[in-house]
């Protein structure tokens, strides 16, 4: 949760013209008067002085800059388009491309660059804003103290928004040193100054208040940085400083709630959120932040972590409603459609969090088991965050879940004959049983429309997975971290909903480069490897469903070649490869993949971040057991996975007319699980074997009882090739996990 408001750039970014060499006393007087009027909020008077200055010195672009700034503040900061246009014109006029900043002239132009960086920040063009801010930081020594602090605070905010916590902490250390030195210098000057006692005391009180506010802001930024880095011990120390300096304000309580959320103390996190006084917040028109929206979103994130997904989606919908209400109020103030950034305070350009909230809603709905509703949310979010490979995977999982059978059918079998007997025809001696077809090959999932049209079809799932693979970097073949498969658990990962469990950490290796994945937090090397495994598993499943066996085999082989592959996905890789090979009539190769000894582990893997997080807790502080649990997936154990392998191996032996081996596999598998857990495909396989053996009555008994019966030892020769009934391909077992992004 990053509820603390960003650096109030609007209050410090524009300073009036200061005296410079080569100007007359009249210009100096007008300049000082203009600045004093601007500081007092008398913008009309300020503009009058600036007009007089413009008449005297028409070539000074700084007067035009200050005029534009004064007019911007006169409009209550609602003419962003006009200010932006003026700044661009001035930039071209002084031929000051950012790349050319290398001298004292650029120090003189620093105010122009800073204002551009602030506008880029509010337009969410963070990379460009960082580029300008870092150039300014190179020349920070000659700057006035207040302006230097403003540059640093802007850069800190940008670094945190882009998950560069280490850089943010470095700048915060510089800021602390700067404020400490400035305070000492001021104390020394006050001792020898000739100001009156009254003016001196007022100035000192005002200066002290500003210093305390800056220190409080620094502590809040440190908490946000440590939260991103999952350094909970350091975060705990800073939280105490925040509570001491900011008290029980909404930003401090939101930050502490986020801290408790990361520790697993979910009830305490909810309690802290509920204790925050939202009514005291200045409002989104002044800060650009809708605190009610953040409140509901954070509650949704906490309940998601507690596996209370229905409550979570309830809170996310409340957050969406608040966000839509705020956006409706803001759009009502815009009158000129050609100026989309005007007619509203500049800070409100950052207010709309619709797409981050849609991301959260989509992930939550996917967990609830409503893939079509989740698809509608995520397909809207992907239009903004189209460079996020994890988001494309989530869309594909929506399509898969919307087009597959129920999980009970796949994992628990059927207690009745519903999945085996399609109908009964005839009467008496002519009575016949029509068995249900279990084949899913070459299924047509769309109705003739283009697969590029975003509908929850398997064809569109294939496109989503292709996009996800293309967005992954190619150099992922040098593993450094422990084996594990963690689908990045994220509900939006930027500053809108929660800090994700895979944010860039100070504990990461130097070789681990973070790949941006907004609105989630960045993907590190280990997360990229795990994500690639999940994408390949889904790709193989989708290709099998579409009947593209060669592509399915290709994806399955690539999956099995991954250096960091969890036991669960390795099991699926062998299963999908075997099914593709059987469809390609390469039975011997398929039998190799179906060897039960290939399955030695079905774990999902453990996130190194969760291990780090646990190590930061005190000895007597236990994490609540209600959240952050590993999903219960199929297969749940090595024995159940080997059972699936044996059932499929029996089918493969049938295709080679090796019925003794098939029967042995079938009954070996049946002995390993409860009779009610036998899948309908295995019962059909037993029926087929008995029919081939000539035991029609026994086959009927198997159908009637819907369970396997003891084997009959005599076998008859098979006269026709069996029809292979493959076990329904299992969807990649890990539910879409994601990182709760909290503000």
Curated annotation (Swiss-Prot):
SUPFAM superfamilies: TPR-like (SSF48452). Residues 77-107 form a coiled coil. One of its GO terms (cellular component) is CCR4-NOT complex. Residues 1-16 have a biased composition (Basic and acidic residues). Keywords: Acetylation, Coiled coil. InterPro entries: CNOT10, TPR-like_helical_dom_sf, TPR_rpt. Residues 183-198 have a biased composition (Low complexity). It comes from the Eukaryota. Residues 484-506, 602-612 have a biased composition (Polar residues). One of its GO terms (biological process) is negative regulation of translation. PANTHER family: CCR4-NOT TRANSCRIPTION COMPLEX SUBUNIT 10 (PTHR12979:SF5). Component of the CCR4-NOT complex at least composed of CNOT1, CNOT2, CNOT3, CNOT8, CNOT9, CNOT10 and TNKS1BP1. This is CCR4-NOT transcription complex subunit 10. It comes from Bos taurus (Bovine).
């Amino acid at each position: 949760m990053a509820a603390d408001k960003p650096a109030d750039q609007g209050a410090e970014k524009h300073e009036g013209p200061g005296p410079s060499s080569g100007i007359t006393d009249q210009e100096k007087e007008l300049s000082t008067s203009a600045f004093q009027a601007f500081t007092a909020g008398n913008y009309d008077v300020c503009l009058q002085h600036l007009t007089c200055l413009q008449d005297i010195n028409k070539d000074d672009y700084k007067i035009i800059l200050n005029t534009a700034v004064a007019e911007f503040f006169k409009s209550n900061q609602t003419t962003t388009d006009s200010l932006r246009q003026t700044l661009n014109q001035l930039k071209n006029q002084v031929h000051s491309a950012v790349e050319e900043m290398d001298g004292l002239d650029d120090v003189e132009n620093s105010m122009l660059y800073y204002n551009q960086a602030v506008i880029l920040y509010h337009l969410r063009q963070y990379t460009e804003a960082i580029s300008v801010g870092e150039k300014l930081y190179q020349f920070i020594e000659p700057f006035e103290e207040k302006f230097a602090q403003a540059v640093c605070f802007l850069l800190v905010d940008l670094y945190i928004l882009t998950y560069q916590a280490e850089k943010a902490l470095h700048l915060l250390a510089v800021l602390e040193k700067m404020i400490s030195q400035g305070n000492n210098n001021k104390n020394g000057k006050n001792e020898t100054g000739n100001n009156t006692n009254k003016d001196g005391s007022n100035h000192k009180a005002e200066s002290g208040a500003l210093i305390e506010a800056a220190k409080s802001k620094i502590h809040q930024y440190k908490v946000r940085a440590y939260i991103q880095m999952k350094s909970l011990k350091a975060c705990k120390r800073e939280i105490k400083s925040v509570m001491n300096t900011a008290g029980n304000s909404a930003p401090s309580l939101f930050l502490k709630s986020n801290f408790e959320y990361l520790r697993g103390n979910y009830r305490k996190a909810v309690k802290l959120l509920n204790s925050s006084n939202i009514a005291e917040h200045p409002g989104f028109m002044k800060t650009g932040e809708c605190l009610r929206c953040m409140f509901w979103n954070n509650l949704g994130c906490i309940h998601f972590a507690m596996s209370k997904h229905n409550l979570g989606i309830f809170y996310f919908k409340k957050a969406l409603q608040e966000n839509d209400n705020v956006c409706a109020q803001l759009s009502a103030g815009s009158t000129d459609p050609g100026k989309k950034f005007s007619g509203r305070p500049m800070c409100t350009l950052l207010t709309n969090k619709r797409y981050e909230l849609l991301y959260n809603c989509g992930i939550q709905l996917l967990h609830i088991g409503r893939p079509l509703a989740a698809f509608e949310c995520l397909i809207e979010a992907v239009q903004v965050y189209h460079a996020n490979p994890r988001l494309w995977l989530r869309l594909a999982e929506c399509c898969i879940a919307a087009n597959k059978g129920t999980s009970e059918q796949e994992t628990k079998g059927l207690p009745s004959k519903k999945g085996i007997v399609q109908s009964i025809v005839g009467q008496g001696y002519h009575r016949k049983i029509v068995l249900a077809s279990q084949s899913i090959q070459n299924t047509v999932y769309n109705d003739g429309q283009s697969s590029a049209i975003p509908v929850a079809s398997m064809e569109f799932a294939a496109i989503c997975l292709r996009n996800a693979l293309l967005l992954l970097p190619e150099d992922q073949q040098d593993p450094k971290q422990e084996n594990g498969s963690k689908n990045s658990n994220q509900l939006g990962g930027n500053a809108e909903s929660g800090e994700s469990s895979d944010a860039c950490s100070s504990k990461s290796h130097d070789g681990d480069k973070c790949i941006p994945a907004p609105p989630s937090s960045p993907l590190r090397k280990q997360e990229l490897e795990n994500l690639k495994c999940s994408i390949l598993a889904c790709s193989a499943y989708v290709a099998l469903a579409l009947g593209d066996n060669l592509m399915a085999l290709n994806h399955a082989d690539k999956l099995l070649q991954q250096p960091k592959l969890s036991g669960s996905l390795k099991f699926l890789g062998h299963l999908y490869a075997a099914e593709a090979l059987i469809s390609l009539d390469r039975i011997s190769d398929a039998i190799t993949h179906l060897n039960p000894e290939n399955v030695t582990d079905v774990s999902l893997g453990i996130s190194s971040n969760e291990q780090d997080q646990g190590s930061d807790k005190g000895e007597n502080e236990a994490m609540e057991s209600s959240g952050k649990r590993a999903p219960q997936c199929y297969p749940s154990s090595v024995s159940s996975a080997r059972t699936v392998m044996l059932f499929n191996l029996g089918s493969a032996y049938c295709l080679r007319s090796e019925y003794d081996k098939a029967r042995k596999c079938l009954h070996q598998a049946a002995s390993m699980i409860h009779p009610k857990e036998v899948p309908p495909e295995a019962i059909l396989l037993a029926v087929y074997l008995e029919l081939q053996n000539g035991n029609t009555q026994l086959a009927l008994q198997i159908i009637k009882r819907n369970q396997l019966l003891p084997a009959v030892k005599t076998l008859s020769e098979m006269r026709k090739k069996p029809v292979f009934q493959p076990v329904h391909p299992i969807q990649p077992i890990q539910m879409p996990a994601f990182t709760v992004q909290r503000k």
